[in-house]
């Protein structure tokens, strides 16, 4: 195997002049003199240090957004501030005997740009930095520099921006002619200007008093060429420019006092400036439908998603129904059958996450290239306070990729090749799902009603009646958990049978008597209703039984009849006749019960308790 050579790259912020110009450093020269091995002679496993001397800020991408001037920019073309251009202008004026009025706003200034670049290493001579533009829009700034139309504007924040021209000469003229010295430097420059004006007046008087020969028309004296006066910058003003001080503007803009200077490479927009913008909170953000106030990141995401869906519909309308989209092969593949026209938009940055925010300045309305001209005009009229501009490539979101992901089917949703086992499994799942639903429903019903206890065996009623007739102990029930009905329903408070066992079963009586159904023996009706007042309601009392007062009367009457029976044999015979009749009736009832089928009664505690709770 070939030997692998490791590399170690070190990035340093500052670089000396030698390596930047491509010259060998003294360390490298000393190493070559000592005879160190060349890179091809490095042994296996050793590391070779390769220094890369570049500034870290140069590696960062440029996220600034440019707002183009639709009215068109102005280019001077030639350096009118150079000494040669000024001399030619003065010679032309003297040749045609023309003396222009002094215009302080349009001065011909000779500025040494090489000296400016040495004094300010990161200066951008084609760009002017302006601050104090709090209530100004992009169009307001373009109209402010209408004498020197700029190419575009780079917004930094609500109060400052960079105005960019296509050449350095126009930017220099705009800075010098549209601004003045600071207030501190004006006092210093006054004395120098007075001395200069006095010297100029003396020279003019000397020229008028001289009796030299007149020159022919179109000729210029060689001696006067050396006496041409150039409107050079004063020493104070030149020092102020070299320090790159803020110069106050000559005129106000919408009541704002502007200050300007040459821009540098450090004048860049900070991340999140659009989110902190008070201008958007007051006047609305055009990139989000003119919404005013604080816009949350979730609201921005929803706005982006709605806009993407709208763009997808527009793209499909451009593509046509007959042109089909190819299959989605890869997530990061390019668009297919979609116009390669970028949709200008800004990126969003999460405050807690490391996503890019709508960082670029949104003071203008973003245009859609698919819009018709008839639709663009009312949009521009309604939102004319911010002019539209094109953004840089680094500031645009990858909308083409998002359109591709939305308009084409996802690989998860696409049909795949399946086997018979997969079909069987899907059928089993479809069968199991309703079974699970049924089991869940039955479990819920059981929880509501309660689990059903195992069925219990009950004794036959006929056997119970036989045992009662023979005065024998009744057979106990199979389950001890089921109590007697009388025990659950309660015993009559005034029942004559005090010592009746709870386990005994009642003898079946006619259904007309309620007390006989509850286990109370039937009493003689004739003896109970001897009173005429009681006989009126005898039909009801035969069913319900006698009251406690009637019971006391009955007992007294029975005692009285017993004592009377000893005296009167007729009464005794009547009593025996009644007993015989009662036995016969009981036998008849027994025969009737024997002919009836077996009857079983099942009453659970839970059902009775549930019925009581419902009542």
From Swiss-Prot:
Annotated Pfam families:
NCBP3
Determine the domain of life of the protein's source.
Eukaryota
Compartments where located: Nucleus; Cytoplasm
Q: Where is this cross-link: Glycyl lysine isopeptide (Lys-Gly) (interchain with G-Cter in SUMO2)?
A: 12, 70, 186, 536
> Residue ranges of region RNA recognition motif (RRM) domain?
126-187
Indicate yes or no for the key word Nucleotide-binding: no
- What are the recorded GO MF terms, alphabetically? mRNA binding; RNA 7-methylguanosine cap binding; RNA cap binding
Per the annotation, the residue ranges of the short sequence motif WLDD motif are 155-158
Concerning InterPro entries, the annotation shows: NCBP3, Nucleotide-bd_a/b_plait_sf
Keyword RNA-binding among record annotations: yes
Task: Tell me the GO BP annotations in alphabetical order.
Answer: 7-methylguanosine mRNA capping; defense response to virus; mRNA export from nucleus; mRNA transcription by RNA polymerase II; regulatory ncRNA-mediated post-transcriptional gene silencing; snRNA export from nucleus
Q: Which Gene3D superfamilies match?
A: 3.30.70.330
Q: Which GO terms describe its cellular component?
A: cytoplasm; nuclear cap binding complex; nuclear speck; nucleus
Q: Which UniProt keywords apply?
A: Antiviral defense, Cytoplasm, Isopeptide bond, mRNA capping, mRNA processing, mRNA transport, Nucleus, Phosphoprotein, RNA-binding, Transport, Ubl conjugation
Q: Where is this region: Disordered?
A: 15-43, 182-233, 332-400, 430-454, 467-615
Q: Where is the composition biased (Basic and acidic residues)?
A: 185-208, 361-383, 506-516, 549-564, 580-593
Into which family does the record put it?
Answer: Belongs to the NCBP3 family.
List the PANTHER family hit by this protein, alphabetically: NUCLEAR CAP-BINDING PROTEIN SUBUNIT 3
Biological function: Associates with NCBP1/CBP80 to form an alternative cap-binding complex (CBC) which plays a key role in mRNA export. NCBP3 serves as adapter protein linking the capped RNAs (m7GpppG-capped RNA) to NCBP1/CBP80. Unlike the conventional CBC with NCBP2 which binds both small nuclear RNA (snRNA) and messenger (mRNA) and is involved in their export from the nucleus, the alternative CBC with NCBP3 does not bind snRNA and associates only with mRNA thereby playing a role in only mRNA export.
Please give the name of this protein: Nuclear cap-binding protein subunit 3
Q: Which organism is it from?
A: Mus musculus
């Amino acid at each position: 195997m070939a030997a692998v050579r490791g590399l170690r790259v070190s990035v340093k912020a500052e670089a000396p002049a030698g390596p930047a110009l491509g010259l060998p450093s003294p360390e490298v020269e000393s190493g070559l003199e000592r005879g160190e091995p060349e890179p091809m002679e490095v042994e296996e496993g050793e590391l070779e240090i390769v220094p890369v001397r570049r500034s870290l800020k140069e590696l960062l991408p440029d996220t600034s957004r440019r707002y183009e001037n639709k009215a068109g920019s102005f280019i001077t073309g030639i350096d009118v501030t150079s000494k040669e251009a000024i001399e030619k202008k003065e010679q032309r004026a003297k040749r045609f005997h023309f003396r222009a009025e002094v215009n302080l706003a349009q001065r011909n200034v000779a500025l040494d740009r090489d000296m400016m670049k040495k004094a300010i290493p990161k200066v951008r001579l084609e760009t002017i930095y302006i601050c104090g533009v709090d209530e100004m829009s992009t169009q307001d700034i373009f109209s402010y520099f209408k004498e020197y139309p700029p190419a575009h504007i780079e917004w930094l924040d609500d109060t400052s921006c960079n105005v960019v021209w296509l050449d350095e000469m126009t930017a220099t003229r705009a800075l010098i002619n549209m601004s003045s010295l600071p207030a501190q430097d004006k006092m210093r420059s006054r004395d120098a200007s007075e001395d200069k004006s006095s010297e100029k007046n003396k020279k003019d008087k000397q020229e008028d008093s001289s009796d030299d020969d007149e020159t022919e028309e179109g000729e210029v004296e060689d001696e006067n060429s050396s006496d041409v006066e150039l409107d050079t910058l004063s020493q104070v003003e030149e020092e102020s420019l070299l320090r790159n001080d803020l110069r106050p503007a000559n005129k106000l803009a919408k009541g704002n006092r502007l200050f300007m200077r040459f821009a540098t490479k450090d004048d860049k927009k900070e991340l999140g400036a659009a989110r902190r913008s008070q201008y958007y909170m007051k006047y609305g953000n055009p990139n989000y439908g003119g919404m005013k106030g604080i816009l949350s990141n979730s609201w921005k995401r929803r706005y982006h998603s709605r806009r993407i869906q709208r763009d997808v519909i527009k793209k499909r309308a451009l593509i046509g129904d007959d042109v089909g989209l190819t299959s989605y092969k890869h997530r990061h593949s390019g668009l297919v059958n979609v116009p390669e026209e970028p949709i200008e938009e800004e990126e969003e940055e999460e405050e807690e996450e490391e996503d890019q925010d709508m960082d670029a300045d949104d003071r203008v309305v973003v245009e859609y290239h698919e819009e018709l001209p008839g639709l663009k005009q009312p949009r521009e009229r309604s939102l004319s306070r911010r002019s539209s501009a094109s953004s840089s490539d680094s500031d645009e979101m990858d909308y083409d990729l998002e359109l591709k992901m939305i308009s084409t089917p996802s690989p998860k949703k696409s049909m795949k090749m399946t086997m018979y086992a997969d079909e069987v499994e899907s059928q089993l799942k479809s069968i199991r799902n309703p079974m699970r639903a049924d089991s869940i429903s039955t479990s819920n019903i059981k929880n509501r009603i309660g689990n059903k206890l195992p069925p219990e065996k009950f004794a036959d009623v006929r056997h119970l009646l036989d045992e009662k007739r023979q005065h024998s102990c009744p057979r106990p029930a199979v389950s001890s958990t089921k109590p007697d009905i009388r025990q659950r329903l309660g015993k009559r408070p005034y029942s004559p049978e005090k010592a009746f066992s709870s386990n005994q079963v009642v003898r079946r009586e006619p259904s007309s008597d309620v007390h006989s159904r509850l286990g109370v023996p039937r009493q003689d009706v004739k003896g109970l209703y001897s009173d005429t007042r009681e006989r009126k309601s005898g039909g009801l009392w035969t069913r319900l039984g006698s009251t406690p007062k009637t019971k006391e009367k009955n007992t007294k009457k029975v005692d009285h009849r017993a004592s009377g029976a000893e005296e009167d044999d007729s009464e005794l015979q009547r009593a025996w006749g009644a007993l015989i009749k009662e036995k016969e009736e009981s036998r008849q009832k027994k025969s009737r019960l024997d002919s009836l089928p077996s009857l079983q009664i099942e009453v659970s505690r839970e059902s009775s308790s549930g019925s009581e709770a419902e009542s």
